[in-house]
UniProtKB/Swiss-Prot annotation:
This is Cytochrome c oxidase subunit NDUFA4. Belongs to the complex IV NDUFA4 subunit family. Component of the cytochrome c oxidase, the last enzyme in the mitochondrial electron transport chain which drives oxidative phosphorylation. The respiratory chain contains 3 multisubunit complexes succinate dehydrogenase (complex II, CII), ubiquinol-cytochrome c oxidoreductase (cytochrome b-c1 complex, complex III, CIII) and cytochrome c oxidase (complex IV, CIV), that cooperate to transfer electrons derived from NADH and succinate to molecular oxygen, creating an electrochemical gradient over the inner membrane that drives transmembrane transport and the ATP synthase. InterPro entries: B12D (IPR010530). GO terms for cellular component: mitochondrial inner membrane; respiratory chain complex IV. The gene is ndufa4. It comes from the Eukaryota. It comes from Danio rerio (Zebrafish). Keywords: Electron transport, Membrane, Mitochondrion, Mitochondrion inner membrane, Respiratory chain, Transmembrane, Transmembrane helix, Transport. The lineage of its organism: Eukaryota, Metazoa, Chordata, Craniata, Vertebrata. It holds the Pfam family B12D.
Amino acid sequence: MLATVMKQLKSHPALIPLFIFIGGGATMSMLYLGRLALKNPDCSWDRKNNPEPWNKLGPNDQYKLFSVNMDYSKLKKDRPDF
């Protein structure tokens, strides 16, 4: 199958950017999905030892991928400890 794809790419070189962008998009989406699965506090893989991982986050912990105008280090703690 890979030989057939390579043969088609050699005969139609205009398809090369299409393969590059689709492959790059698929790679970036898998990396983002992995980041969500490992770093997001809403997702818990170990229910016995850490059933509620969102309770261990402080107000100055950044778990978003991108924040525009927010400086998390200057926030005060306004939540009770559990």
